[in-house]
Structure formats: structure tokens, C-alpha cells
């Protein structure tokens, strides 16, 4: 008998995002996967802020991507400049119904349709200091591992069927 359900309905969705934001995120994650990048949604940073999507390249470059689904969403959110301290590149991501000219020119920009995305504008690089890189990379790894554990618990799968190293080094 289950005494406590720690996973809720779906361990991978926290329920704060609108359907439109989830659509943008899905398309963006498909593109990032094609770019051989891995991503963690809603990554809690040491400042206490949550990055909509954090991405890590095979070479260790860290990106923060803020998802904006309307003009109002962009207008009321003024916390995004703080994210520069936690990434090598800062991007926005949106969909076709949001005018692209509202986004700052000194940030990258993605356009997503839920089935994929493309880079409208690349983000300028502002490399993290080594200590900052280590802290954000560790937060990324811990969040990813924790969410994997919750997803496994929610599925009831013990993972006895596969090798513990399956998928590493690809």
C-alpha cells in the first residue's frame, strides 16, 4: 500500500507551464537534442530563480533559454538579465504569434512550433568563470539525476532489464 505519492501525476512536468509554453519547450528540446545538447527544464539556480530551460553542450557550454509566449509575458518579466551570470549564452524562445522584434538584440532567439525549432539569432558568448561553470554544471547534473530518479519511481521500473552504463559515451 502506497503511503505517500511523491511523484504526483507526472514526475517530468511540474504544472506551472501553460500548454503554449510546453509546446515551445518541446520544439526547442527537439532542436537541442538534434544539436547533441542535453537540457533540464525549470533549473533552480543558486539565486533562487528558475531558468525555463538550461542546456549543456558536449563541450560543456551552458545556455539558459527563457520561454516567452506573449508580449505581456515578456513585458512583465524583468528577471531575465540576472540569468547572464549563470550561462555562457542567453536566449529567448517563442512561437510564431509573438513579434520577434520585442526581444533584445543582445540575446539569442529561437522560434519553435512544438515539432522543432530554429535559431533566429545566435546569442553572443559571455564565458562563465571556472567556479561559476562548476556550480551551474553541478546543479544541472544533480537536477537531472534527481528527476531521473523520480521518473523511475513514478514508472515503477527497477531498471533491472538494462545495463547501468547504457547510453553513456554516445
Short names for language-model regions:
Residues 40-46, 56:
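Catalytic cores of RNA-modifying enzymes
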Residues 24, 49, 75-79:
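Amphipathic coiled-coil/heptad-repeat helices and related helical stalk/stem segments
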Residues 69-113:
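Catalytic cores of nucleic-acid endonucleases
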Residues 2-17, 22-38, 47, 102-170:
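Non-catalytic C-terminal interaction segments of nucleic acid-processing enzymes
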Amino acid at each position: 500500500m502506497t503511503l505517500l505519492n511523491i511523484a504526483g501525476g507526472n514526475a517530468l512536468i511540474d504544472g506551472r507551464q501553460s500548454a503554449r509554453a510546453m509546446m515551445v519547450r518541446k520544439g526547442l528540446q527537439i532542436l537541442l537534442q538534434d544539436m547533441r545538447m542535453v537540457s533540464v527544464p525549470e533549473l533552480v539556480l543558486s539565486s533562487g530563480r528558475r531558468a525555463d530551460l538550461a542546456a549543456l553542450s558536449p563541450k560543456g557550454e551552458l545556455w539558459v533559454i527563457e520561454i516567452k509566449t506573449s508580449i505581456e509575458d515578456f513585458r512583465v518579466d524583468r528577471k531575465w538579465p540576472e540569468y547572464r551570470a549563470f550561462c555562457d549564452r542567453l536566449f529567448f524562445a517563442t512561437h510564431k504569434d509573438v513579434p520577434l522584434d520585442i526581444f533584445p538584440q543582445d540575446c539569442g532567439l529561437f522560434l519553435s512550433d512544438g515539432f522543432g525549432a530554429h535559431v533566429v539569432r545566435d546569442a553572443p558568448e559571455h564565458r562563465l568563470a571556472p567556479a561559476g561553470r562548476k556550480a551551474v554544471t553541478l546543479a544541472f547534473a544533480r537536477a537531472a539525476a534527481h528527476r531521473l530518479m523520480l521518473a523511475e519511481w513514478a514508472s515503477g521500473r527497477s531498471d533491472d532489464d538494462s545495463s547501468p552504463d547504457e547510453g553513456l559515451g554516445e
